[in-house]
Amino acid sequence: MNYEFEREIGFINSQPSLAECLTSFPPVGDTFQSSSIKNSTLSHSTVIPPPFEQTIPSLNPSSHPRQSRPKQSPNGTSPLPAATLPPEYPWMKEKKNSKKNHLPASSGPAASCLSQKETHEIPDNTGGGSRRLRTAYTNTQLLELEKEFHFNKYLCRPRRVEIAALLDLTERQVKVWFQNRRMKHKRQTQCKENQNGDGKFKNLEDSGQTEDDEEKSLFEQGINNVTGALLDREGYTFQSNALTQQQAQNLHNGESQSFPVSPLPSNEKNLKHFHQQSPTVQNCLSTMAQNCAAGLNNDSPEALDVPSLQDFNVFSTESCLQLSDGVSPSLPGSLDSPVDLSADSFDFFTDTLTTIDLQHLNY
């Protein structure tokens, strides 16, 4: 049993010699190296498998504490440093560089996209700056372009090529200049329209205010005219009332004028009526009768009926008002309306006037 165990132990201890056997085939490595370098069909993703010792953990000397002693090859060189130092081969270096280049591209596509955008933006910005410098036109070029824009807002391609060749410009420069000029023209027209609209609106407001002022002035003039007419009317009524009062006082004092009245039988009732109303009317009538009798011819049979034409006087409105004031005692109390006469006084006036006219015609 012990012998068998020792044999097994010896077999186990002899396992590292297998690795030494594997590393003792340099022609295989040389052929693989030469083929990988010469063969251009190998992709970058192909990875050379690690050594056989790393794939099998039982063969790995680091996993066994018993294999602490260094292993020596027949040539006297240690195989482990050779296996753990792959950068010695140039094709390994190429593979690592390719892996480093591919891993960031595969792991961060977003970062690569951003970097590409940045790289694209940078030349664009630099190109934009250079383009802005190229937009400096000479006075002659601007003059010719303005003339052409005055006649044609849009250019056809043949004309654009012709102008570009004439002014020593590129076709793109001419096209961009016309685009910018059209936008400028549009802004100018819009500003003018806005200003005109504001001016029209202000003019409308001013016209509306003037119309309102005219209407107000006309209304005020009408009010002033009406008030003036009312004031004149009130003044006229006040003067007429004062005159009527003064004349009424004169009648009461006996200073009244004589009026030609014919003493006809048809007017006797009216005379009696007035005699009963006021005593002053009797004096007036007696004086009028005396004047009429003095002016008549005594020999004529119509001496008591026909008055003389010299003493004939037409009744005026003031005399009528005087008589009405003397006849009716109610009129002095109501002096606001001087034309407010009684029915009896109107009958008296109409009868006297008609009789006088008839007598004049008969005479």
UniProtKB/Swiss-Prot annotation:
Keyword entries, A-Z: Developmental protein, DNA-binding, Homeobox, Nucleus, Transcription, Transcription regulation
Domain of life: Eukaryota
Compositional bias segments (type: Polar residues): 31-46, 55-78
Residue interval(s) of motif Antp-type hexapeptide: 88-93
Protein name: Homeobox protein Hox-A2
Chain spans, region Disordered: 23-133, 183-216
Pfam families hit by this protein: Homeodomain (PF00046)
Organism placement in taxonomy: Eukaryota, Metazoa, Chordata, Craniata, Vertebrata
GO cellular component: nucleus
Family: Belongs to the Antp homeobox family. Proboscipedia subfamily.
Chain's role: Sequence-specific transcription factor which is part of a developmental regulatory system that provides cells with specific positional identities on the anterior-posterior axis.
Species annotation: Heterodontus francisci
Record GO terms (molecular function): DNA-binding transcription factor activity, RNA polymerase II-specific; RNA polymerase II cis-regulatory region sequence-specific DNA binding
Localization (cell): Nucleus
DNA-binding residues: 130-189
